[in-house]
Amino acid sequence: KLIQMKENDEGTTFVFLDETNGQIIGYCTYCASGLKKAYENDSITYPAAEIKYFAIDKTYQHKSYDDDFKFSDLMLCEVLKKLIEISEEAISFDYILLYSVPEAVNFYKRNGFCEFTEFMKKDSYNYIDGCIPMFFTL
């Protein structure tokens, strides 16, 4: 179950609850952003959403939901559905961005994200040092 908790300067945060026991499974914070693409001597920024934080309790990280999906896949799918809904109903954007820790890159690739191409410019925030910039195209 996805529950909206709060909105602040970081973005909007949602918490995932296990409905069988009320335990918090994980959380996600997303916000408005932009994807910068370089073109010769110029760059263009395209509207995007950014998943700033996506964390899952260790007991659920590799736990299967059923034979086909893991809890982590279903939770990310819920976030993507919510962002697609926002794009269609409120703020139009074509990309969802995130900065992945190296050990989670395969998880995001399995769920449709790609690493930035050579023409995409990453942000220079300190908290993303060592993280891999990735994008999902709507």
Predicted regions and their residues:
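Non-catalytic substrate-recognition and accessory regions of acyl/acetyltransferase enzymes
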Residues: 1-66, 74, 78-96, 101-138
